[in-house]
Amino acid sequence: DVLGSRGLGDVYKRQIHILGLFDYRIPGFQPASERNRYEIAIAGNLKAEKCGFLKDLKQVQGNLEYHLYGPNYQETEKNPQVIYEGQYTPEQLPSVMKEGWGLVWDGGSVHECQGAFGGYLKFNNPHKASLYLASGMPVIVWEQAAIAPWIREQKLGLTVKSLEEIPELINRMTEEEYKEMLQNVKKTGEHLREGSSLKKITDEIESNEQ
């Protein structure tokens, strides 16, 4: 243990601060007041290596619509439930997306997040989660994702083992439960849009230096 043997371990520990979710600054933005909980937004780089699961969304039974936002989308088979909305800048996206959920899912399967991109969700803090929440949308995330426990605790969305679970979970949810989730998202979204995550860290650093 090099750090420990040289007495540097505690120094490094004191200098580490946990950011949590990334901020998503959108000054003056007001989220949509009405959302359709049977519509799901999928935003980001839609290349096949990262979002290969898109071709198999037809395996997910139910009356859901998937709205895609981002570059590199290649439609392999027509699916009336999948709608490509085009490519927008990060600043434009929150005003464009009106769906009821934002999906955080990577890999080539609807059954689990697979491959390098899917496995990375076990460790990283996906920026698209901040995008969705700042836009006013609850999120749907893989149950093994690093952010899944926090999403459950804060009641900011759904965590699933497989995308095939989504229709039943949404159908079981009452309108009151969904509205409560939207209220939770509203509060978190305000913090992300105002840059509260970074401000919290800078306040901690300043406090430690005093």
What are these regions (language model features)?
Residues D1-Y12:
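Single conserved hydrophobic/aromatic residue that forms the stacking wall/gate
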Residues Q154-V160:
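A short acidic/histidine/glycine-rich donor-binding loop in glycosyltransferase catalytic cores
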Residues H17-L19, H67, L103, I140, ...:
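Hydrophobic/aromatic beta-strand patches that form the interior of the parallel beta-sheet core
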Residues L21-K98:
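Conserved catalytic-core segment of nucleotide-activated headgroup transferases in glycan assembly
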